[in-house]
């Protein structure tokens, strides 16, 4: 029989009875929102009456992310500098290198997201995959993965702001780029600090709509330009020659940029603890959108970019004075369409700022989960009445000051360092999601549990998890080879640590945790795994009955409905 999960302490967003009876104004409500949530126990013992409550929840984090917001986060949430800016440097390796690398990464990302859909719909917990690694792999490894993911997001915020300062140079101006960075910095921190989860969700929704409309519009325009609708006349496939400029090593190097551009896709799993509605239905539905984003907004778009911009174009990042330009903007500008490059550059800026906004959310929720697991300072556990992890947001704000490096002449070198560090850490995150899914499935079998009690089963099955894990490990190994023997150069210690610093940090945290806890077991035993705590449905029998009814209803549906439900 499954273990019965203990009930978490309940909280409400109310203030004290005296404060409520006075009907405080906007300023007092604002101040009170930073106070701790009030435990429901205070209601039961009479210190606060139930009529004074505006609403409550079972955990300090607010379940206020709507279905449409989750779907747009999955569909367009991670479209940022990796695709719109860093792809310029990747294109210098040739258009075929660009497309092959993105396709390879996309295949094992899809498998990874299916694993995450199964785990997050079953266990919609704060911290998501960091907690899954602790539960199903090893506490030390899970801790290392948590810090790895927290580091990824805390670095991404200044990275995106640096990218925005590079992009804004498109418009000639006497205004120092640091001024724009300051404006964007205040906007992002203010959104997370004063708007909370609702503001994050709505901001991501609007930004994703703008990004996706911009990319769809670019794709339509690109087809017209390729067919001869621009100043360059008929372009065809001439820019696809040569398809490779740096050989096999070029493809491998682009894998890092491709991973960085797709990193953050897993963020939708991190929202599981704050999703409104039934997590077992909402999350898988949102995660299924990833397939269409990969096909339409990445592979198709990058193919068209390869047709329009030659790999030898000096305007690409690292190629000269036009280092801040997006390859998308270059393509439109070379087409001779006045005004439109500026419009698309606005889309690029929106994308960069939206990712920076996600970075604050991602770091604050990950470090909160680590604190709840007892492996991060307890100050990070503080969540106020609006569901804001204040210490995590404050830490993001402090590290975000690195974005003012945009005033330095070395900003592009900093950009390259941050891209490399962030991109490599993603392989560890994705690989751990696959490993956690594999071990979870094995534990289910060892403990005699049925897969019928899972609210959602991964379309790719456990074989997809094995494929995802193997590919992540393989790419890490190839990146190690490239770090030791770089393209067109000799072995260099500085270059190696620039490319492989994330692996060093993961190993360091893993060893430190092992030594600190003196837990020398390599992995959690299958028979000892906790398969019940954190479940969205405590009564397994009722869940099985509901799932059986849903399966019977599904069988009666026409084939096109089944096709749609499987893929969408």
Swiss-Prot record:
Residue positions the entry lists as glycosylated: 45
Disordered, as annotated region: 1-29
UniProt cross-references to Pfam families, sorted A to Z: AA_permease (PF00324)
Entry's induction text: Expression is under control of the CSY1 amino-acid sensor. Expression is also regulated by PLC1 and GCN4. Expression is induced during development of rat catheter biofilm.
Disulfide bond residue pairs: none
Compositionally skewed regions (Polar residues) per UniProt: 9-19
Gene3D superfamilies in UniProt: Amino acid/polyamine transporter I
Entry's Gene Ontology cellular component terms: membrane; plasma membrane
Keyword Oxidoreductase among UniProt keywords: no
Stretches that traverse the bilayer: 70-90, 96-116, 151-171, 175-195, 206-226, 250-270, 290-310, 343-363, 389-409, 418-438, 468-488, 493-513
Predominant place of localization: membrane
Function: Amino-acid permease with rather broad substrate specificity. Transports many amino acids including proline, methionine, leucine, valine, isoleucine, phenylalanine, tryptophan, threonine and tyrosine, but not basic ones (arginine) and citrulline. Functions as a sensor via detection of some amino acids including methionine, leading to a rapid activation of trehalase, a downstream target of PKA.
Family annotation (PANTHER family): AMINO ACID PERMEASE (PTHR43341), GENERAL AMINO-ACID PERMEASE GAP1 (PTHR43341:SF1)
Protein name per the record: Amino-acid permease GAP6
The species this protein was found in: Candida albicans (strain SC5314 / ATCC MYA-2876)
Primary gene name: GAP6
